[in-house]
UniProtKB/Swiss-Prot annotation:
Organism (species): Arabidopsis thaliana (Mouse-ear cress)
Transmembrane region(s): 2-22
Source organism phylogeny: Eukaryota, Viridiplantae, Streptophyta, Embryophyta, Tracheophyta
Lipid bilayer topology: Single-pass membrane protein
Gene3D superfamilies recorded: Cytochrome P450 (1.10.630.10)
Main location: membrane
GO molecular function, one term: heme binding
Cofactor: heme
Induction (free text): By cis-jasmone.
Keywords assigned: Heme, Iron, Membrane, Metal-binding, Monooxygenase, Oxidoreductase, Transmembrane, Transmembrane helix
Keyword Transmembrane helix: yes
Protein name: Cytochrome P450 72A13
Localization in the cell: Membrane
Amino acid sequence: MEISVASVTVSVAVVVVSWWVWRTLQRVWLKPKMLESYLRRQGLAGTPYTPLVGDLKRNFSMLAEARSKPINLTDDITPRIVPYPLQMLKTHGRTFFTWFGPIPTITIMDPEQIKEVFNKVYDFQKAHTFPLGRLIAAGLVSYDGDKWTKHRRIINPAFHLEKIKNMVPAFHQSCSEIVGEWDKLVTDKQSSCEVDIWPWLVSMTADVISRTAFGSSYKEGQRIFELQAELAQLIIQAFRKAIIPGYRYFPTKGNRRMKAAAREIKFILRGIVNKRLRAREAGEAPSDDLLGILLESNLGQTKGNGMSTEELMEECKLFYFAGQETTTVLLVWTMVLLSQHQDWQARAREEVKQVFGDKEPDAEGLNQLKVMTMILYEVLRLYPPVVQLTRAIHKEMQLGDLTLPGGVQISLPILLIQRDRELWGNDAGEFKPDRFKDGLSKATKNQVSFFPFAWGPRICIGQNFALLEAKMAMTLILRKFSFELSPSYVHAPYTVLTTHPQFGAPLILHKL
């Protein structure tokens, strides 16, 4: 009997180990080689597959080298931010494949193909190759199919233009407080002062999203912002280990800290959401902030079609991260570029004077700022917050004249596209807001070559929010100060999920 039990145990163990070996072999060798063969038969050029790691090691090595030294203000930023994709583009042409571990990733530069990917949201879905990213922000941005449709329907009312216009006073309050602090610094230094604007802008946009999303101040939401910033750094570090199967489950110090930070964020958000729900049940009038509008929209859904408390919390996480991060990045590069291009700074200031005079900025006036809009679009073109988007294919698909197998990813290289000379002309790398003077369609020649907020059905729901907030901030800043780059400024854009200034952004502010 003992022999029989032992034999069965050994047999089961052999089967389990054999199954695991077979699955591993299939994942790290057989399937990648099959997909590589398929893509090459389509005429696609790309890198040869390296078992398990793919191109990650080469990519990280080039990125580390690029980040090790700053660049000149007039240099192209793409070799510093996306060195490996740029090299592959030069080597293999405008459609090529590389490897994210064992997953082939096809980079496309054709606007018609990009348009097709954006439009077919049920066929080209969000890639989930790095689950740790969901710790910092999941929600609407990470969903597909019917779940995405449901969440988009519920969240949409919170971002209607009329609702966003009602948030302009909150924009004004948060921006005025920071401008007031800068004014004190400059006054103390007798009309001119060096200020690293980066941490101030981080604080300002955090305060804006705290007020407009949750009706609170930055101090109340400060812990969430601190935890999300810490998570962003930890996730970037963990990304280098992403190729190791099951790495996120290893009890490393970094993994334990990520999970602890994520738990703390959920605990804080659960308290915020539950407090609102209790107030609603007690008969209090709903708040007119993003969370209040979201809860009202959710309660208005038929039974079974609303969001759970957990799902509401995920959307709140996304509000906090995307609502703060995107506008901070847009504002810092706007001020850096206007410091370089004093003529455009003067034009923007003159427009602000013409539209508002001495009046307090309002939504109607902000929407009349044509020069400001041109400047912001050009900044978004040259320094997009997110440098690429990725989509996944789960079944054989036709994309233009390509037939692509299930199991591959599509990379939409925002930065490379928006600085591409074939699409934007020989001056693609230059700061020329005039290219947008007749609107987006004319500037892009009706092609999908400008998509800092994505494009099509999945275009960023907070686009108008970010642009209106940026216009308010720049209006108040331009009224109060002129500014130029400090001699201590070091030009070193790099990515920490979004495009940050690696060594801050010290400017010289002059009081007007």
